[in-house]
A protein has these predicted regions:
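Glycan-recognition and catalytic cores of secretory/periplasmic carbohydrate-active enzymes
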Residues: 1-395
Length: 395
């Protein structure tokens, strides 16, 4: 048995950091964007701007938490690509994706994507003090507030010129959503990162408005879950429980709310976050230590998805830190970590984590190792948060 923070250090040193360092594209900038299940790297695969932002965040945060200056050039490499290629200098905002050599591939603008750039740029600024990174983050904050909102909250998908378009990218399960829980969560996260870097009262005000929506519109107290997809008036479009997003929100919104330092607000949001974490513990945690993906109209999707496992470790640790008497949260965090080590980690030479496992426990060979959504953000952040928190958990 070892302390989970030490296990996290080992995971970073032995697997995550070497893997993502090796994807640096020295010739065309940024990081390679696609590797198939068999670990074949496609050097001409698309480069998702979300993936690049998440890599920038990962190396920036890792350099800070591990106090390892050797990681700064990897963060800078992602930063240069974001600044020079991902940003649209004509219309503002960040493109959805680029070609392998840095030309716009999908030039649409999505609120979710802008938020991740803010999150990454804020971390890079905190690491380096680079004023330009902070200015870019502030510009994207202003852009979201000006171009991606209406009186009810945040909208989702836009053309390059910021004309509204349909939200295919963040809609799933056969619905077309005008608002999503997922985008709201990550706008809050990006703003929290910017607030951590600036203590800007404007950013704090936007965060508080998001928390009002979270508490009043997203959270469903009767079902102990977040609703996922909405029309413009926040009517839920589908009976869906996203176990991964619920456990992620339970710690991430808790963290961001804590930055604001408002006692009453913290108390109100903490009650919601604890309810979400408890519901995942009761309904989604499996006897083998895994957490299933989601439940749509009463039917459970039993895939074990990489990011859901990572967020579950962190969500259960956070819930136990808030409620030390509830040792079942502490035990659950250890169980999920052990499941990750046994099943989700891809132990092949040059492997990282499998995208997901089928219900029979075999890796899904259709899912690649790297693609625009498969990134070091969830598993890397889990490790870095475990090191930062150093909870009394052994695995």
């Amino acid at each position: 048995m070892e302390r989970i923070s030490q296990a996290a250090r080992n995971m970073l040193a032995d697997r995550l950091l070497p893997f993502w360092k090796a994807l640096r594209d020295e010739e065309n900038g940024g990081y390679y964007g696609y590797m198939d299940f068999d670990l074949n790297l496609d050097k001409k695969g698309e480069k998702g701007c979300i993936l690049n932002s998440r890599i920038l965040w990962f190396f920036s945060q890792a350099a800070m938490v591990l106090q390892d200056d050797s990681l700064i050039p990897y963060a800078r490499h992602a930063y240069d690509f974001l600044r020079e290629k991902c940003l649209d200098r004509e219309y503002g905002g960040v493109f959805w994706s680029l070609t392998w050599d840095g030309k716009p591939l999908d030039d649409s603008k999505h609120t979710y994507n802008q938020a991740f750039a803010i999150y990454a740029l804020s971390a890079y600024y905190r690491l380096t003090g680079e004023r330009e990174a902070l200015e870019l983050a502030r510009e994207l904050f202003v852009l979201i507030e000006k171009k991606c909102t209406d009186k009810g909250g945040y909208l989702e998908a836009f053309s390059r010129e910021f004309a509204p378009v349909s939200n295919e990218k963040l809609s799933e399960n056969g619905v077309m959503a005008e608002r999503t829980m997922n985008t709201l969560l990550h706008v809050f996260e990006g703003y929290a990162g910017l607030y951590q870097a600036t203590n800007d009262p404007q950013v704090a005000g936007a965060m508080e408005r998001i928390l009002d929506i979270y508490a009043a519109k997203i959270y469903n107290p009767e079902l102990h879950r977040q609703e996922v997809f909405f029309d413009r008036d926040y009517n839920s479009l589908i009976d869906l429980t996203s176990y991964g997003h619920d456990i992620e929100s339970s710690w991430l919104i808790d963290w961001g709310t804590g930055l604001l330092g408002r006692a009453e607000l913290t108390k109100k949001i903490a009650a919601i976050d604890s309810d979400l974490a408890g519901h995942i513990l009761r309904t989604a945690l499996q006897p083998d230590g895994s957490v299933v993906n989601e439940c749509e109209r009463g039917v459970v999707d039993e895939h074990r998805v990489w990011w859901v496992q990572a967020e579950s470790v962190l969500g259960f640790v956070n819930a136990w830190e808030k409620h030390p008497e509830r040792v079942e949260f502490r035990e659950a965090a250890a169980w999920v970590w052990q499941y990750i080590q046994k099943k989700i980690v891809d132990s092949r030479p040059g492997g990282e984590w499998f995208w997901r496992l089928n219900s029979d426990g075999t890796p899904d060979r259709e899912k690649p190792t790297v693609e625009p959504w498969k990134c070091p953000y969830h598993n890397g952040r889990m490790c870095l948060e475990l090191i930062r928190r150093d909870p009394d958990v052994y695995v």
